[in-house]
């Protein structure tokens, strides 16, 4: 039986439009197979090679000073592309993130890299609009609707928002996942552990539903990462 691999993804940026020089400063992505979180994720803070506007800082709390010693996008691009390969991306307001990711990829000037396509993306914002016409569709509003604990979300953050979105997405599609412990600010450690997926194993269809022990280890792993801040 083939496995359904989905990547719940979020980014934080310096602004709203990459055509005005804005860049990605954080990527958070979490793997889900057959609607079960596997414990594999990808998380990096990224040096945008520019200043951090105060308006953006107020949203996510990531300062230019904090990002000075973080890697450039070009140094993590290959690992990121490997992590999301052969999967459907789950994103809230997908055009925004895809626009920024494709801009970052275009700056690499590598002809072998294919741009990301919205056709391979599920937009939870669109899902929510179709399911609940006239309601509020922000991530916070959907957390409230589905009773997902977002009490620690004073600031935006790519990894913690991806964790929240994972629960919201499962609720939107008829199921639930265990609750994650959220953080209040970005961690002050240079790029906490990144556990990338074995893409070849996924291709061979070897991925199976995690055991109870694996799920517990996953929860402890995510909690450890999110508590660091």
UniProtKB/Swiss-Prot annotation:
Documented EC number(s): 2.7.7.7
Residues that hold a divalent metal cation 2 according to the record: 10
Disulfide bonds: none
InterPro entries from the UniProt entry: DnaQ, DnaQ_proteo, Exonuclease_RNaseT/DNA_pol3, RNaseH-like_sf, RNaseH_sf
MF GO annotations: 3'-5' exonuclease activity; DNA binding; DNA-directed DNA polymerase activity; metal ion binding
GO biological process, one term: DNA replication proofreading
Record: residues binding substrate: 10, 12, 55, 60, 161
UniProt-annotated binding residues for a divalent metal cation 1: 10, 12, 161
Organism domain of life: Bacteria
Active-site annotation: 156
Function: DNA polymerase III is a complex, multichain enzyme responsible for most of the replicative synthesis in bacteria. The epsilon subunit contain the editing function and is a proofreading 3'-5' exonuclease.
Record's protein name: DNA polymerase III subunit epsilon
Species lineage: Bacteria, Pseudomonadati, Pseudomonadota, Alphaproteobacteria, Rickettsiales
């Amino acid at each position: 039986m083939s496995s359904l691999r989905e990547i719940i993804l979020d980014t934080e940026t310096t602004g709203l439009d990459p055509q005005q020089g804005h860049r990605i400063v954080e990527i958070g992505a979490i793997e889900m197979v057959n609607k079960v979180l596997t414990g594999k994720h990808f998380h990096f803070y990224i040096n945008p090679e520019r200043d951090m506007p105060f308006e953006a800082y107020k949203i996510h709390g990531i300062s230019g000073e904090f990002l000075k010693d973080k890697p450039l996008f070009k140094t993590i691009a290959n690992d990121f592309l490997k992590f999301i390969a052969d999967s459907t991306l789950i994103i809230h307001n997908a055009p925004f993130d895809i626009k920024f990711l494709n801009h970052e990829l275009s700056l690499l000037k590598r002809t072998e890299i294919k741009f990301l396509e919205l056709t391979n993306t599920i937009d939870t914002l669109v899902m929510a609009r179709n399911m609940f016409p006239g309601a509020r569709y922000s991530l916070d509003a959907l957390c409230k609707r589905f009773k997902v604990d977002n009490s620690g979300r004073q600031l935006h953050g790519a990894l913690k928002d991806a964790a929240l979105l994972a629960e919201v997405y499962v609720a939107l599609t008829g199921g639930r996942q265990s609750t994650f412990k959220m953080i209040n600010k970005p961690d002050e450690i240079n790029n906490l552990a990144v556990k990338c997926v074995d893409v070849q194993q996924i291709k061979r269809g070897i991925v199976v539903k995690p055991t109870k022990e694996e799920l517990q280890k996953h929860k402890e792993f995510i909690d450890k990462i999110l508590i660091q801040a």
